[in-house]
A protein has these predicted regions:
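Mobile genetic element proteins and their domesticated derivatives, centered on retroelements
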Residues: 1, 17, 21, 53, ...
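Basic, flexible linker segments flanking DNA-binding modules
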Residues: 1-61, 162, 216-224
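RNase H-like two-metal-ion nuclease catalytic core shared by retroviral integrases
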Residues: 39-40, 44, 133-135, 141-142, ...
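An active-site-proximal beta-strand-loop segment
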Residues: 55-98
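Retroviral integrase
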Residues: 64, 96, 108, 116-119, ...
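Active-site beta-loop-alpha junctions of metal-dependent nucleic acid enzymes
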Residues: 82, 101-124
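Short small-residue beta-strand/loop micro-motif enriched in glycine and branched aliphatics
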Residues: 94-100, 155-158, 182-183
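C-terminal domain-tail junction helix/linker
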Residues: 149-153, 175-227
Length: 227
């Protein structure tokens, strides 16, 4: 489920993710092994859209350009390695995670849940929206393509095997995993899920960016709306 509005998190500006994890009693064991990138490409299984974004990642209009992708995490239960998957949607206006879903399997349902939330959040955009992704199987599905068309949304896809066409998502996943995942072993799905949820809230509300005039994504959006 989406916890953007439901997770209780400290309001102290200097409190980082590690301290929040400690406060919530989340225990992890360190290790240093960088996981292989998850690849959702299964060939041409549906409709492959043209790359309409062309790496034009900047926009001065909230909710106009949205990008998405899927990434994989590993955790352990009773000594057995298992996996979970994160499907976030990011607004290129302010790099805010506007919706996401975490699941135990790489399913279209998980992509669709996050998509529906993103459609609702961005429905106030006065211009035609563009939703960008890679050529993963879920984004080629008939239901996904039809849903974007029904909302008059341009669908855009990266060129095959070109991660730079969706570098915003690549950088986001890299940052997330560097700060809360690499160097840790999680003992349950719930533990890993909670840490991801906490970090996304921290990222949206606390993590300042130079390109956002040293504001967090949500601060930048609110400042824009109030001016």
């Amino acid at each position: 489920m989406n916890y953007l509005s439901n997770v209780a998190i400290s309001r102290q500006p200097q409190e980082g993710t590690a301290r929040l994890m400690k406060k919530l009693g989340l225990r992890v064991t360190s290790y240093w092994h960088k996981s292989r990138k998850y690849n959702s490409y299964k060939g041409k299984v549906g409709t492959v859209a043209k790359n309409k974004l062309h790496r034009r990642f900047r926009t001065s209009i909230p909710h106009q350009k949205i990008t998405t992708d899927t990434t994989e995490f590993k955790y352990y239960e009773d000594g057995i390695q298992k996996k979970c998957y994160l499907n976030p949607y990011i607004d290129l206006f302010n790099s805010e995670v506007i919706s996401y879903h975490i699941s135990k399997q790489p399913s279209y349902q998980s992509i669709d849940i996050a998509l529906n939330q993103a459609l609702a959040v961005t429905s106030d955009c006065p211009y035609r929206r563009t939703f960008h992704s890679d050529q993963g199987w879920g984004y080629q599905m008939r239901d996904y393509v039809s849903k974007l068309k029904s909302h008059r949304i341009f669908q855009s896809m990266s060129r095959k095997g070109n991660c730079h066409d969706n570098s915003v998502m690549e950088n986001f996943f890299g940052l997330l995993k560097q700060e809360i995942y690499y160097g840790h072993i999680f003992s349950s799905f719930e533990e890993l899920e909670q840490v991801i949820v906490i970090w996304i809230r921290y990222y949206n509300t606390k993590r300042i960016k130079q390109k956002l005039n040293w504001m967090s994504p949500i601060q930048f959006r609110l400042n824009y709306q109030n001016n």
